[in-house]
């Protein structure tokens, strides 16, 4: 095995199996594009994005790791979020949580 090498079984792999998801409609009300990465706590994204923030608390985009979603000015789109796993302790981002969810 080479350091960092991944040995993955053949076939389909379901990401985030068994985790709660929520779907929200997001609108970019700003005048600049906003890009959100796969593991960013969605509740704390740029304030120019209008959506049900309470529903997004403790969730991130349900997309592959290392990818992102871009919201152009005036654009509205529906995204699926998946609950954060692990200890569910959030620090940093925009400082809106700074502790346990």
From Swiss-Prot:
Heterotrimer of UreA (gamma), UreB (beta) and UreC (alpha) subunits. Three heterotrimers associate to form the active enzyme. This is Urease subunit beta. Signal peptide: none annotated. Belongs to the urease beta subunit family. It is found in: Cytoplasm. PANTHER family: UREASE (PTHR33569:SF1). One of its GO terms (biological process) is urea catabolic process.
